[in-house]
């Protein structure tokens, strides 16, 4: 008999590795996965030190690169993400390079973005935030998902 929608989530048999060393990202994923009954681990939990270069041209490519690298190194299914802001007036930039398009802090990137859009009418400030997840298994299986939020830069 299938589980009732009100049944509590069942714990996963195999832990999932959160393929990130970013403490904020790890805490967010850990909270979501645990609430769903998923046993999750971090690279530090299993003594794994791995830096993966984000060499992809798209958010999807970067998420897949990271998930596959962590799955291969750990022997565990591994969940990775990549995200970015795409601004219509900037031809979709900064996109996949959102965290690197302006050196420095988030505040510096916000300031640069607002300066780049200065003088544009609100209707020309369309943008979207995209986040892509990739779950890779050591045997090569792969599952991906994407979410996006459409909006306007103030």
Indicate where each model-derived feature is located.
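Anionic-ligand binding patches
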Residues: 2-17, 21-154
């Amino acid at each position: 008999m299938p589980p009732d929608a009100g049944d509590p989530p069942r714990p996963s048999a195999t832990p999932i590795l959160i393929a990130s060393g970013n403490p904020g990202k790890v805490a967010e994923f850990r909270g979501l996965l645990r609430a769903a009954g998923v046993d999750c681990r971090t690279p530090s939990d299993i003594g794994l030190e791995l830096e993966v270069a984000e060499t992809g041209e798209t958010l999807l490519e970067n998420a897949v690169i990271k998930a596959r690298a962590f799955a291969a190194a750990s022997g565990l299914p591994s969940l990775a993400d990549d995200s970015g802001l795409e601004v219509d007036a900037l031809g979709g930039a900064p996109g996949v390079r959102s965290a690197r398009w302006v050196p420095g802090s988030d505040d510096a990137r916000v300031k640069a973005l607002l300066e780049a859009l200065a003088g544009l009418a609100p209707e020309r400030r369309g943008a979207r935030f995209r986040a892509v997840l990739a779950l890779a298994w050591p045997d090569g299986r792969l599952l991906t998902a994407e979410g996006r939020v459409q909006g306007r830069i103030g």
